[in-house]
Amino acid sequence: MINKTRHNARRYALQALYQWFFCETKPDALISQFMEEHDLSDTDVAYFKEVVTGTIQHVAIIDELMTAHLDRKISALNPVELSVLRLSIYELLHRKEVPYKVVIDEALELVKEFGAEAGHKYVNAILDVLSSEIRKGV
């Protein structure tokens, strides 16, 4: 069963990270803007704030891990798929209490909703490999 408040946090985090991709707004300003413009009443706001801030703070490490498994340059990725991958890799690295299957399932749902038609297949392939690497022994 899907945790709706956590799902909504990821959904808004994806949108915030997508926006950050284009304008690199500071995390606090980005979060404040989302808090003002969206009804987050059915959202795990603390989780939203953490994953947005954490993903942006750790983007260099996240991108380095991801790049080793890409079949193209990171700059050639669809911005939605890139944002979903960054968010999911952050969760795999820093939210170990969240099962890797949940991270992947949520990522696929987000890509199906916001991304290119076959984007979920690409995201699944990358996260499948990375989840094994990151969560070894977990």
Swiss-Prot record:
InterPro entries: NusB-like_sf, NusB_fam, NusB_RsmB_TIM44. It comes from the Bacteria. GO terms for molecular function: RNA binding. GO terms for cellular component: cytosol. Keywords: RNA-binding, Transcription, Transcription antitermination, Transcription regulation. Coiled coil: none annotated. GO terms for biological process: DNA-templated transcription termination; transcription antitermination. Involved in transcription antitermination. Required for transcription of ribosomal RNA (rRNA) genes. Binds specifically to the boxA antiterminator sequence of the ribosomal RNA (rrn) operons. Belongs to the NusB family. This is Transcription antitermination protein NusB. It comes from Coxiella burnetii (strain RSA 493 / Nine Mile phase I).
